[in-house]
Amino acid sequence: MLRFAITLFAVITSSTCQQYGCLEGDTHKANPSPEPNMHECTLYSESSCCYANFTEQLAHSPIIKVSNSYWNRCGQLSKSCEDFTKKIECFYRCSPHAARWIDPRYTAAIQSVPLCQSFCDDWYEACKDDSICAHNWLTDWERDESGENHCKSKCVPYSEMYANGTDMCQSMWGESFKVSESSCLCLQMNKKDMVAIKHLLSESSEESSSMSSSEEHACQKKLLKFEALQQEEGEERR
Ligand SMILES: *[C@@H]1O[C@H](CO)[C@@H](O)[C@H](O)[C@H]1NC(C)=O
Ligand SMILES: *[C@@H]1O[C@H](CO)[C@@H](O)[C@H](O)[C@H]1NC(C)=O
């Protein structure tokens, strides 16, 4: 029975990998593959859409620039805010599952990736005293000839730019993210995403907004198990 479950899981994972591949951004691979030497974004090292060398840019705090975007146009981000920004960058560049939410009009982009409310609230809390000048980081910049970003408007605190975590998550990267009504079928950019992803992938993208309550229930149950297991591992290590 266990062997059957493992085989089935292998079939499901390999078919979803083939189905989705990677996004078509400038740093993305065609298909995810292992990257054992990643400096950052190690959540995705078993199956990654970015090369390990991409993550070198994220390895030293303060992070000044990633690809051709400066992160410090309104001063250096605080360490806690930087950490959240890095999680989003890692997901977009490296997650083998990001393409599940590919924007059909623009295949380098994602749309409506479900984030957990708690993740957005924590992110907002971490950044609220940092400053930015772009409401939408994808579009609200002046780009020079080399494609580097410059402020178009004045720098203001995050807490002035966005009303709350929900507003921030749903505005900062355009349509890329939405806050989920579920506390389980949503991503928070840590190991628990494994549980959520498994359930989210079993739904077709059209139905994702009306996720069935049985899927929700199954997810919650798995998450509890997963948390118990993590706690056990933590205690063994002590
Ligand atoms: C990163 O590594 C990949 C594969 O090893 C290579 O194709 C690419 O050119 C490298 N990129 C940079 C910026 O070094
Ligand atoms: C968050 O801000 C939005 C936009 O201003 C508002 O509609 C929403 O009610 C706020 N949510 C909470 C929980 O305060």
Swiss-Prot record:
The modification Phosphoserine is found at S204, S205, S208, S209, S210, S212, S213, S214. One of its GO terms (molecular function) is signaling receptor activity. GO terms for cellular component: external side of plasma membrane. Disulfide bonds join C22-C49, C41-C90, C50-C94, C74-C155, C81-C127, C116-C186, C120-C169, C133-C151, C184-C219. Pfam families: Folate_rec. The keyword NAD does not apply. The modification Pyrrolidone carboxylic acid is found at Q18. Plasma and yolk RBPS have the same carbohydrate components, whereas egg-white RBP has a different, ovomucoid-type carbohydrate chain. GO terms for biological process: negative regulation of sensory perception of bitter taste; negative regulation of sensory perception of sweet taste; riboflavin transport. It comes from the Eukaryota. Glycans are attached at N53, N164. Keywords: Disulfide bond, Glycoprotein, Phosphoprotein, Pyrrolidone carboxylic acid, Signal, Transport. Yolk RBP is synthesized in the liver; egg-white RBP is synthesized in the oviduct. Residues 1-17 form the signal peptide. InterPro entries: Folate_rcpt, Folate_rcpt-like. Belongs to the folate receptor family. Required for the transport of riboflavin to the developing oocyte. This is Riboflavin-binding protein. It comes from Gallus gallus.
